[in-house]
């Protein structure tokens, strides 16, 4: 599933081609995504795209009439293409622009979403209760310590909780905990402030580096230009269960935590 870096890379790739462009059509070939795609052609045709933003793993395409809320789901991608590009399997939606280009949404598994919001986006049910963005000052050790106070849940589950901090999915939670030397099953509320300080710094550094590398391509993700992300070449633990630790040489352990595969080093990462 595309995580925050992959969504941000997509935003950076499509924004220069969308901002200040006029929408001339919205073609919906298959509206049966995670939620039914609303018929918003009347609202969006003729509108000028003002900006393309990201909130958590959602892309927000703003016009004066409202905002398209796009989620890539498990396997979705957005690409800027010439308007006459042949339609391929799983090309479900085209946002057609007056400049002869289209924004094409492809999603083989159809767990993605394309929704519409005429309210301020912070009022939308999907966005209203989200936690802070990890690459902003709002995500800091004081905020994290307060959010974790008294929690008995495993720290990895808390790190992936969008009410605590957004956009840190399975890949980057594994990597950040390894870099911080924290066992993924450590009780969140008992981690001291010094270790939380390191964890916050590692989350920020790893996400920022992943964005610079174009995200992580494991199976489905490609950038807006169709190229893969290269952060997979930098992974220390994710997807490496049973292999040797890059730090100490110990065999990495693999468990299921919150129904997600979790990989860690039992020597380098402590509770």
Curated annotation (Swiss-Prot):
Gene3D superfamilies hit by this protein: 1.10.8.50, MutM-like, N-terminal
Pfam families per UniProt: Fapy_DNA_glyco (PF01149), H2TH (PF06831), zf-FPG_IleRS (PF06827)
Zn finger spans (FPG-type): 236-270
Active-site annotation: 2-3, 57, 260
PANTHER family for this protein: FORMAMIDOPYRIMIDINE-DNA GLYCOSYLASE
EC number(s) reported in the record: 3.2.2.23, 4.2.99.18
InterPro entries given in the database record: DNA_glyclase/AP_lyase_DNA-bd, DNA_glyclase_Znf_dom_DNA_BS, Formamido-pyr_DNA_Glyclase, FPG_cat, MutM-like_N-ter, Ribosomal_uS13-like_H2TH, Znf_DNA_glyclase/AP_lyase, Znf_FPG/IleRS
Alphabetical UniProt keywords: DNA damage, DNA repair, DNA-binding, Glycosidase, Hydrolase, Lyase, Metal-binding, Multifunctional enzyme, Zinc, Zinc-finger
Superkingdom of the organism of origin: Bacteria
Residue positions binding DNA: 90, 109, 151
Gene: mutM
Family named by the database record: Belongs to the FPG family.
Enzymatic reactions: Hydrolysis of DNA containing ring-opened 7-methylguanine residues, releasing 2,6-diamino-4-hydroxy-5-(N-methyl)formamidopyrimidine; 2'-deoxyribonucleotide-(2'-deoxyribose 5'-phosphate)-2'-deoxyribonucleotide-DNA = a 3'-end 2'-deoxyribonucleotide-(2,3-dehydro-2,3-deoxyribose 5'-phosphate)-DNA + a 5'-end 5'-phospho-2'-deoxyribonucleoside-DNA + H(+)
Cofactor note: Binds 1 zinc ion per subunit.
Lineage, uppermost ranks: Bacteria, Pseudomonadati, Pseudomonadota, Gammaproteobacteria, Alteromonadales
Purpose: Involved in base excision repair of DNA damaged by oxidation or by mutagenic agents. Acts as a DNA glycosylase that recognizes and removes damaged bases. Has a preference for oxidized purines, such as 7,8-dihydro-8-oxoguanine (8-oxoG). Has AP (apurinic/apyrimidinic) lyase activity and introduces nicks in the DNA strand. Cleaves the DNA backbone by beta-delta elimination to generate a single-strand break at the site of the removed base with both 3'- and 5'-phosphates.
Summary of subunit composition and partner proteins: Monomer.
One example GO MF annotation: 8-oxo-7,8-dihydroguanine DNA N-glycosylase activity
Protein name: Formamidopyrimidine-DNA glycosylase
Cofactor needs: Zn(2+)
GO biological process: base-excision repair
């Amino acid at each position: 599933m595309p995580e925050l870096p992959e969504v941000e890379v997509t935003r950076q790739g499509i924004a220069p081609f969308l901002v200040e462009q006029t929408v001339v059509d919205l073609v919906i070939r298959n509206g049966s995504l995670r939620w039914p795609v609303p018929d918003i052609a009347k609202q969006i045709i003729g509108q000028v795209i003002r900006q393309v933003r990201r909130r958590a793993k959602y892309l927000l395409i703003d016009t004066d009439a409202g905002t398209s809320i796009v989620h890539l789901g498990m396997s979705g991608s957005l690409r800027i293409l010439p308007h006459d590009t042949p339609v391929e399997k799983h090309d479900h939606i085209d946002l057609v622009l007056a400049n002869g280009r289209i924004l094409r949404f492809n999603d083989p598994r159809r767990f993605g979403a394309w929704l519409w919001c005429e309210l301020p986006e912070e009022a939308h049910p999907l966005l209203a209760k989200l936690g802070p963005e990890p690459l902003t000052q709002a995500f800091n050790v004081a905020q994290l310590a307060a959010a974790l106070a008294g929690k008995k849940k495993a720290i990895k589950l808390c790190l992936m909780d969008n009410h605590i901090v957004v956009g840190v999915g399975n890949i980057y939670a594994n990597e950040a905990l390894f870099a911080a030397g924290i066992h993924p099953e450590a009780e969140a509320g008992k981690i001291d402030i010094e270790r939380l300080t390191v964890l916050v710094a590692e989350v920020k550094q790893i996400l920022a580096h992943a964005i610079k590398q174009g995200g992580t391509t494991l199976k489905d993700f490609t950038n807006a230009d169709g190229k893969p992300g290269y952060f997979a070449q930098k992974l220390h633990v994710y997807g490496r269960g049973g292999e040797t630790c890059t730090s100490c040489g110990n065999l990495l352990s693999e468990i299921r935590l919150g129904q997600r595969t979790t990989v860690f080093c039992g020597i380098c990462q402590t509770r």
